[in-house]
Structures are given as C-alpha cells and as structure tokens.
Amino acid sequence: MRTKNEKSPLKAFMKQRRMGLNDFIQKIATNSSYACKHSEVQSILNISPPQEPELLNENSSPPPSPSQQINLGPSSNPHAKPSDFQFLKIIGKGSFGKVLLARHNADEKFYAVKVLQKKAILKKKEEKHIMSERNVLLKNVKHPFLVGLHFSFQTTSRLYFILDYINGGELFYHLQRERCFLEPRARFYAAEIASALGYLHSLNIVYRDLKPENILLDSQGHIILTDFGLCKENIEPNGTTSTFCGTPEYLAPEVLHKQPYDRTVDWWCLGAVLYEMLYGLPPFYSRNTAEMYDNILNKPLQLKPNITNSARNLLEGLLQKDRTKRIGAKNDFMEIKNHMFFSPINWDDLINKKITPPFNPNVSGPSDLQHFDPEFTEEPVPNSIGQSPDSILITASIKEAAEAFMGFSYAPPMESYL
C-alpha cells in the first residue's frame, strides 16, 4: 500500500503537463506577436478587450495587461510599480486590504500606501465605491484638512493609492486615551472638520461617513479627513440620495428611516462627533444596536450642564432629527461657520494653519509610530505587496478585475509629480 507522501506515476505526469501548459499560456499572454493574435486562441483564453461602449468613458483607459507598466506621468517619468517602494510597516487595515508606511526609492519620501485586493472588492460588489473614493481624492489637493492623493496605479490583483502619510494618530485613538476633550480643543477640531466638509459640499460631494476613526491628526495636530469610500458624488445643493450606508453610532434619523437624505447628513455626523468629543460617547449610544437606532429615531437629545450655552445650542441644531430644520439646511457650511460657538475662530487663519493646534502629537519623524496600533505595526509586511511580477497567468477572474477598474490609475501633472 502506498503512503500519502508517495506520488503515483499518473500524478507526476499530470503535474508535468500542467506546468508545461502554464508556461505556454504565459508566453501567449505576455507576447503580443505570439499566437494570441489568432482569433480562436483569443476566444479560448477570453482575453480580448471589452467592446461594450458602456464600459468605457472619456476618462477611461484600457485595462493594463500583466506585462504592461502603468505610466504615472509624461514619458520622461518612470512607470509606477510596487517595487518602486520599500514597504516598511503595516499601519492600518480595512475590509479590502491594508495601509502601509512606504518610502519611495527615487525621492526617499514617505507615503501611506493603501493596497486593496481586487477580488475582495469584486466579491462584495464595491468597485463603484472604490472608484468614487479615487475620484474624490483627486479633488482633495486644494484643501489642507483632506488627505491628498499623489498618484494611483494597479497590478493585475491589487489597487494602490499613494497618499499623504499622516502619523499623529486617529482622533478615535486620542479620545479613547483621554476620554473627552475640553471645549476649546473640541471647537478647534470641529472647525477644521466643518471646513473640510464645507469644501466637499462645494464640490457636490456628501461625505457620509464622518466618525473619529476617519479623522486623523497630522504631525502638528491639525485635522485630516481620510477614507472617502462612502462619499456620494454629484449631489447638488438641493439634491438627495437614498443609499443606506454609514456607521451605526453616527447614522442620521433620515438614513435609518430609509428616506431620501441630503448633505445635512454630514452636519448630523459633525454633531455626533462634537458630542462625543465633549462627553466621551456618541449622543444616542447603546451596546444594543437596535436600541441605539430607536434612540436616534425617538429619544430626545440629553445634554449635561457642563458645556457652554453656545455649545449646547450648536449640538441641538446639528442633532435636530428633522433635517429640514437642522443647522446647515439652508446655507450649508456658512450657517456652521457663523454660529456663536465658533466666534473665537478666525476662519482665514484656520484655513491657512496659522492657529496653533491645542494638542501636539510630538512625533519625532516619519518613523515614529507611537500613535499607531501595535496590532498593525508588529505584523510582518507580506513580500507580495512590493513585488512587480514580469508576467502572470491570466485567468477569467483577473480579466474581470482589470475591466472593473479601468481608469483607476492616475498621475499628477509633471510639475506636481511626487
């Protein structure tokens, strides 16, 4: 009787045939002058580019073949690929991948690189949200409190966002450590957040996912909003949308009611975050999600007396259950900006970062990871993330992934490159 470790002659023969077939298909896939030009071979491999016009738009580009590098700028610039970077540490995780601290080999600058698995995105049918995130990131470059995208590219299996590296820690981390903030500190953060939201609204973008985990502090202590996967584009000032999305603790009543909602949903979330900064928990929090939803819909807002009248008035206006009566419903950001709670704020100085932040994260440099969770930073970086394979076996799933993210890659103009 054969043991489990013994291989039958038939198995050895089949393995040899499979290896030979893989080599043959790789040659076909990576050599445009090879038999791939034959229509029957194309049909069998199913790697012809899609012809449906609805899959393309004026900004789209064909999906890259496995041997094709992504051009990040004019022809004088190098093509982007994972091996252009040294991936140093994992600094965050999400549903579809990881965020890593990386150093660019050419200029030795540090970036946060968001690496997403295409298969995971397609499995959950989230490709539209990922492309929306990329589109919003492209518009962020002109605002100081929004994370910036330097460029993006893709391999056959992954998407790469090359982002500003922000290492002052999540607002969530600092709230957990300190429990709550004094009113001047909460006001400063709320003002910078409101400024960022107002800018997004001016571009007809609704953020929809404001929460302490998506609010970062930079190395000086200024606010930076990140994670734009739930943003909704093309929402005019009086426009609405109806997708049920967000984080339970911060959902507005109209979202829970599954009613059409508008940009005032972001002002509700600002109220929830401001409340949490002042009191230590979201306004209608319960460990029981169903009870928390009922609280959001029906429970009156309860404010303890340890805040000023202006803070109380602002929270009551932001956490108004009727969105048509909510502060910001008429004149959006201008209503928030002109509220008496923010009277100590010089908004021109704020936007120009001339106001000294109330808290300094005291980071010594890019390699200072004290404000990141050790659960992430102590995990080994997978070697595959930084590899740029010269060729890869094309499968139907890889072809589907390439088509789903056409137009993802982005390079800035030459003068702003890196």
Swiss-Prot record:
It holds the Pfam family Pkinase. It is an enzyme of class 2 (transferase). One of its GO terms (biological process) is apoptotic process. SUPFAM superfamilies: Protein kinase-like (PK-like). Residues 68-78 have a biased composition (Polar residues). It comes from the Eukaryota. GO terms for cellular component: endoplasmic reticulum; nucleus. It is found in: Cytoplasm; Nucleus; Endoplasmic reticulum. Residues 50-78 are annotated as: Disordered. InterPro entries: AGC-kinase_C, Kinase-like_dom_sf, Pkinase_C, Prot_kinase_dom, Protein_kinase_ATP_BS, Ser/Thr_kinase_AS. Residues 343-418 form the AGC-kinase C-terminal domain. ATP binds at residues 91-99, 114. The active site is at 209 (proton acceptor). SMART domains: S_TK_X, S_TKc. The keyword Transferase applies. Its main location: cytoplasm. Keywords: Apoptosis, ATP-binding, Cytoplasm, Endoplasmic reticulum, Kinase, Nucleotide-binding, Nucleus, Phosphoprotein, Serine/threonine-protein kinase, Stress response, Transferase. GO terms for molecular function: ATP binding; protein serine kinase activity; protein serine/threonine kinase activity. The keyword Phosphoprotein applies. It catalyses: L-seryl-[protein] + ATP = O-phospho-L-seryl-[protein] + ADP + H(+); L-threonyl-[protein] + ATP = O-phospho-L-threonyl-[protein] + ADP + H(+). Protein kinase that may play an important role in cellular stress response. Plays an important role in activating certain potassium, sodium, and chloride channels, suggesting an involvement in the regulation of processes such as cell survival, neuronal excitability, and renal sodium excretion. Belongs to the protein kinase superfamily. AGC Ser/Thr protein kinase family. This is Serine/threonine-protein kinase Sgk1. It comes from Xenopus tropicalis. The gene is sgk1.
